[in-house]
Amino acid sequence: METVHSTFLLLLFVPLTQQAPQSQLDSHVNYEYATGNSEETKFSQDYEDKYLDGKSIKEKETMIIPDEKSLQLQKDEVIPSLPTKKENDEMPTCLLCVCLSGSVYCEEVDIDAVPPLPKESAYLYARFNKIKKLTAKDFADMPNLRRLDFTGNLIEDIEDGTFSKLSLLEELTLAENQLLRLPVLPPKLTLLNAKHNKIKSKGIKANTFKKLNKLSFLYLDHNDLESVPPNLPESLRVIHLQFNSISSLTDDTFCKANDTRYIRERIEEIRLEGNPIALGKHPNSFICLKRLPIGSYF
């Protein structure tokens, strides 16, 4: 009787324990054993239920990977344009030197040529470097330059057109170099300092100073001059020619031989010491001066 009863109960519950649908099993397995992808599976199913309902099919959203050309276009839009050639030329100079309010200080930085300068530069101090030559290209398009100082370089030559376009240049210092001659000088020059070079008289043309009507200070001491440069302008106040090889003077060197009343008003100082000349033997050379030159008279 008990056996019959057990069999009856078994037959009663078997229909109630059917296998779950495959989709539910898959979902259950994904949830239990692949938890890392469970959300991804659920999102995919929801997406299909929502958009792929058989009536209005919409494209699935996809991730677009830009190609190399697209990336380059985006890059070009973000990165600012490169500096112009002028800016590239200026930046290195102002990193190596000091650029301040129109003045450029390039002292003792071992440059061997004139660096590119900001166009607004008015003063350049390039002292104690290794510059060997000056050319017209060094100062092209630099109309505002008023003072140049190249003291203590190795300059041997200066092209004649180097300063021709520097119409505002007033002070030019070339002291302590290796110059053998003077170039053509700009018309508004007030000071020329070329002391401690190797300049000879043949290295100065007859008209070098003739038209320099604003020149006040001339320093040519410690060179190899055999005579005083000709045609010195009336504007000169100070002339330094000491320690050269000057051995003779004429009545026209500083004065006018044919005009005994002529007085050279502006001359304040002439230095001729250290030359192989006895100034006392040339009294007529100084008759127009208010002060006698400094030097040996005997």
Swiss-Prot record:
Which cysteines does the record link by disulfide bonds? C255-C288
Q: Which residues are glycosylated?
A: N88, N258
The cellular location(s) given in this protein's UniProt record come to: Secreted, Extracellular space, Extracellular matrix
Q: Which GO terms describe its cellular component?
A: collagen-containing extracellular matrix; extracellular space
What are the protein's GO molecular function terms? growth factor activity
* Signal peptide start and end residues: 1-19
Q: How is it modified after translation?
A: Contains keratan sulfate.
Q: List residue spans for each LRR repeat.
A: 112-131, 132-155, 156-179, 180-199, 200-225, 226-246, 247-277
From which domain of life does this come?
A: Eukaryota
Q: Of which family is this protein a member?
A: Belongs to the small leucine-rich proteoglycan (SLRP) family. SLRP class III subfamily.
> What's this protein's name?
Mimecan
Give the organism the record lists.
Answer: Mus musculus (Mouse)
For this protein's source organism, the top of the classification is: Eukaryota, Metazoa, Chordata, Craniata, Vertebrata
